[in-house]
Amino acid sequence: MITKESIENLSQRLNIVDIIENYIEVKKQGSSFVCICPFHADKNPSMHINPIKGFYHCFACKAGGDAFKFVMDYEKLSFADAVEKVASLSNFTLSYTKEKQENKKELKSILPSLNAYFKDNLKHHKEVLTYLYQRALNDKDIAKFELGFAGASEDSIRLLQNQKIPLEDAMSVGALKKDENNEFYASFIWRITFPIYDHKDLLVGFGGRTLNPNVPAKYVNSPQNILFDKSRIFYAFNIAKENIAKKKEIIVCEGYMDAIAFHKAGFNNAVAVLGTALTEHHLPLIRRYDAKVILCFDNDEAGLKAATRSAFLLSTNKIDGKVAILQGGKDPAELVAKNESTKLHNILDEGIELGEFYIRRLISTHSIISALDKQKALETIQKFTFNLEPLVANSYTSLVSNLLKVDEKFIVLSQNSKKTIQTPLISQNKYNFPKEKIHIAELELIAFLKQHPDICNDFKQISDSVCFKHKILLDKILEKKGYEDSDIREFESKNIRKNLNYSEFLLGICKVNLAFLNNVKIKNSTLALKKQLFTLIDKNLNLLIKNLNTAELNNFLKEYLSFLKYEKNEEILQQSFRNLNGIFGNKNFTAYDLGFSIQNNDEPF
């Protein structure tokens, strides 16, 4: 593992212009440099490079980042691989955490030895070969996907011992396990083996299928270990990646045999997940290939749930694609085995766009008989569409209108929708929040979260990243992304005050929440987002009682009450006033102390 200090030293010494010049012709323009952007069909130099700040930016496609990010995207490398490439181009010697690095290097040789044994062993088990032939596989398929067979546990252990491989090391890469008596046994016993490679063509684990109907677990994967993390890996990606790059499309299915079947049917860009659905850890790999995603899952409850979760994940992360559900209880392997590959082509062609699929699934979980039912369904949909780009969100207006049988004028799917840009929610609010101060305050709050990852859950309980202009950066901090992310590296290079205390942090979140409510212009006061924000602020008040002195709390409540004075939604008012009454009682001051009186109709109660 490369040390962070080594990466920082390399970052300070490298010249980003020199790095990019290794890939594209660069021309000087004033104090900066320009070049043709390699990340879109650029004809004029749209990419600008700032050698002082060490960042590039394309004004056409918005690609940008530091030298590491450029190499990652250009060569489709992981962060660690990109760092090594940049170091090589810069004649820089990186430092590694030696023990772990050397140990990992030794461990990488264990699984290939086992795989060679499994492949050879398959030849001696005709009953297993017969099963594979019955599943419409031939010798060419078996060789292409390196299928094998794991026999008795003692056979695998004997092989490892003969090759002088420490059994503890074999266990650390998932080849062995220990029983209740602390005795070693093989992870794969009497199973067909499917070797699993990562995106760098490193063998990191196996899948195994039993032919014994009495064994409850038909399929198993290698256990999680130093090499294998099933939430980050696709089966058959090593075979499919060239075609994924060419087609800019990836088919994601449920199992090993399904992925193999897709390849037999001519879909050489197919892979399989190793769990029930996609995870956020798969997204960087998909983005690296700029690929649209076709989800092809079974039409059972598990398949539909996996497709729904995956459609939400992809849509909200700006990845395009569609969902193709297999009907009739057949999976791709069955269709190919029965020479029905044409049906597979038709199923993929008739797939439903990701967002539309997710919205249809959401509505299917609601009764939409009464107007109130439809309002609740709409608010559920808004929780999804408010996470999308406005143009994308508004493209679903007609769909939602038709499904709910509600006029389009009542369908608001984007916070920035023209339908919502009317008069300000609070036109008389005298408390203005200077944009520059909010910008600085946000960065300070984000820096505090970066320093104290243990309070990320506190933040999620009392605010929402949608309130922040730096939403993408904040989400990355909340996801606990590290130095390998270019936005995090750029953020850490800024000179931001980082000596906040917890009470300042809480008060700062409240200020940002209120600033968002102050600036957003929402006609419909029952929108889910607005109700959610008021609820979050109310939750935050209880924390403020414990962490702010009376004067600080007094000042904040003045600003908060100025919003509530003009609120028309009874549900919001009742809940907020209940919370406020408790605060007034605890702090021994009243609404009158905050400048409100019945005589001038400013009394909030």
From Swiss-Prot:
Pfam families per record: DNAG_N (PF08275), Toprim_2 (PF13155), Zn_ribbon_DnaG (PF01807)
MF terms in GO: DNA binding; DNA-directed RNA polymerase activity; zinc ion binding
Reactions that this protein is recorded to catalyse: ssDNA + n NTP = ssDNA/pppN(pN)n-1 hybrid + (n-1) diphosphate
Cofactor binding annotation: Binds 1 zinc ion per monomer. Binds two Mg(2+) per subunit.
Key words of the record: DNA replication, DNA-binding, DNA-directed RNA polymerase, Magnesium, Metal-binding, Nucleotidyltransferase, Primosome, Transcription, Transferase, Zinc, Zinc-finger
Residues the record lists as binding Mg(2+) 1: E254, D298
Zinc finger (CHC2-type): 37-61
GO biological process: DNA replication, synthesis of primer
Cofactor(s), names only, from the UniProt record: Zn(2+); Mg(2+)
EC number annotated for this UniProt entry: 2.7.7.101
Quaternary structure annotation from Swiss-Prot or TrEMBL: Monomer. Interacts with DnaB.
Family membership: Belongs to the DnaG primase family.
Comment, domains: Contains an N-terminal zinc-binding domain, a central core domain that contains the primase activity, and a C-terminal DnaB-binding domain.
The protein's role, per its UniProt record: RNA polymerase that catalyzes the synthesis of short RNA molecules used as primers for DNA polymerase during DNA replication.
Protein name listed in UniProt: DNA primase
Organism encoding this protein: Campylobacter jejuni subsp. jejuni serotype O:2 (strain ATCC 700819 / NCTC 11168)
Originating gene: dnaG
